[in-house]
Every structure is written in C-alpha cells, then in structure tokens.
Amino acid sequence: MQYIISIILIFNISVVNANEIFNLLKIPNLEIYNTNSLNGLKYLYAENNFKIGLKKNISCDKSKKNELDKKYPIVEKNLNKYKAAFLIKNNLKFIILCKNLTISSIKTGGVPNILKRSLILDINFDPKYFERMIHHEFFHMIQAKHNRMFDEALWSKFNRTSFKYAECSTCSDRTDLSLYKNTDGFLTEYSKSIPSEDMAETFSFLMTNKELIKKKIKNDLILNKKVKYL
C-alpha cells in the first residue's frame, strides 16, 4: 500500500510541475532536467514535440535522453560564465532543450524571450558552432532588455561607408557562421546580415575565444571599435 501511495504522490508532483511550467512559459510538453544550477538557471527539456507562437510557427522536437545528457554539460558550462545577478538583470531564468528548432520552417539555434525569461536551444545545432550559438542567442536577450545601450545606427558607422547591411536577417543570404581569415570588420558572413546579428556574433566570439579576438583586432581597426563598443 505504501508503495502505491508513493507512486501516486510522485505522479501528482510531476503533474503539478508540468502545469506550473506551462503556466509560466506557455510551452507544452516540458519536464525538469535540472533546477540546481550554480547561477539559478532552470533547465527544462521537451518530453514531446511542441509548437508555439500565435501562428504555431515555432516548433521543436523532443530529444532522446542520451542526446540531452551529452549536450547538457556543454550548455551548462557556457551559461555558468554568467553570474546569477547578470542573468536576472537580463531576464533569463529558463533554458529549454530540444532539437530541430525552427521558426516558420527556418532552422535556428535558439529562440530568446525576455518576457517569459526563457531561451529555447536546439541541441542538434551544428557542433562546430554550438557553444558560440548559446552566447549569440543570449546576447539577443541582453540587447532586447537594454535596447538603448546598443545603438545600431552608431554600430553601422563603424563599417566602411561602402558596406550596407541587409534589410532583415531572414531576407539575407549571408548565413555562413565560419570565421573569416581576413575579417575587415566582420568575423563571419552572418555578421554582415544586420547590425543586431553582427553584435551577437562579435559577442559570441568574445565569450568563447577572447584570445582569438585580441589577435584579430590588432590588425582590424573596424573590429577593434566594435569590440570596444561591446
């Protein structure tokens, strides 16, 4: 009898947790992965596929446990670079882990939401750029929270006068994330899409390979200005 009661209690607690998570984030099918991180982040995972957004245009698939267990330490290691106070200041509390993340059928590494204090991450993202992607997506939250601090018009003036950004990131074919050998103000092709993506790319390199950036800015005046701005 005690065994049966214990099973019922565990089931009820799981239901309560699932309901609380949904009420907070409005994302279905989430379960707790870890809530005891060093900086207070709560890690959740997709137990089943989900679609969210007004038009259900954001979708992500559930991950197998072995996939989660492999990628979680990488995610935690990178996000542990931020102290709890900084995360609170930038409205990040919940990390949602899933795979094959898309927005309107376009693949993406992450979906930040400062209103829900959440960041959805695709653990199936290209391993070469996975760690950078984490910081890239978090930067979008930082910029959204402190929009006045990041003047995109001023940022654009750092570039050569002949250069023009695209109208939007999704209407640009500048998508390559590999590092340029000759930067000339831009670390990757994706940096050339729009100012906010350029900022996020620069920030992501600063958080993952600061020594490389120090070398690059010695011979790149434009990139030097951008790094100092951030």
List each language-model region with its residue ranges.
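Classical Sec-dependent N-terminal signal peptides that target proteins to the secretory pathway
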Residues: M1-E20
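Intrinsic-disorder-associated interaction segments
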Residues: F11-S14, N34, D61-K64, L68-K71, ...
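Non-catalytic architectural context of zinc metalloproteases
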Residues: N19-D69, C98-N100, E167-Y180, S196-D198, ...
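Non-catalytic terminal regions of proteins
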Residues: G40, E47-N49, N90-K93, L121
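Auxiliary, metal-adjacent structural segments of Zn-dependent hydrolase domains
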Residues: F50-L115
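Active-site-flanking segments in enzyme catalytic domains
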Residues: F94-L230
